[in-house]
Amino acid sequence: IENTAASLEGRGPHGLFHKMQEVRAENPDLIYYYQSDYKGYYDHILHDKMIDIIKQYIADPILLPILIDFVKVLHPDGNEGISKGLRSSQFFGNLYHNDIDHAMIEECGKDNYNRFCDDIYILGDNKKELWKHRDTLHRLSKPYNLIIKPSEKVAPVSAGMDALGYIDYGDHSRIRKRTKVNAARKLAKIKSRKRRQ
């Protein structure tokens, strides 16, 4: 899916952010957005459902048990939650949400629906339609044991859409303050290490 960007080669937060800007530039009526985030996304992934999804794509008798072990590595006796640290978990997270993505694209249009990991952004030309999309997302997420945080919102882009490390105001955007602070800290650590060498 073109508008999902997490853990996919050549697709990161900056690319997705700029793609959303391009879509809005081509469609100036898209002045509102819906934004949501799942609560503990990886912690709520159901093992049985994840394994069923994997089996739809992989039947290899050697590879399949290995992938099932990756799903269960964090909670071998439980039925919920996958490790956040493994590269395979990022892949599983994308795969787990794939059917929801397709259904939402069908409803919202491929250019209006965007997802990065567990953050979802839907662009629209009116609030009522975005609230309808919100209800659909809640309904689709429920069977997957995914819970949307209460901080979700529908708002005008001009008020500042906080997305993917940027704040977009429609006519201009800027880097989020905490993104700049974190980058400055990392740079200071690198400089400090170089001085000690």
Which residues does each predicted region cover?
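A short alpha-helix capping/helix-loop junction motif
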Residues: E2-A5
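Right-hand nucleic-acid polymerase module
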Residues: F70-V73, G78, W131-K132, H138, ...
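A common structural junction motif
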Residues: I58, H138-L146
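Conserved polymerase palm-domain catalytic core
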Residues: R11, L16-C117, I122-T136, S151, ...
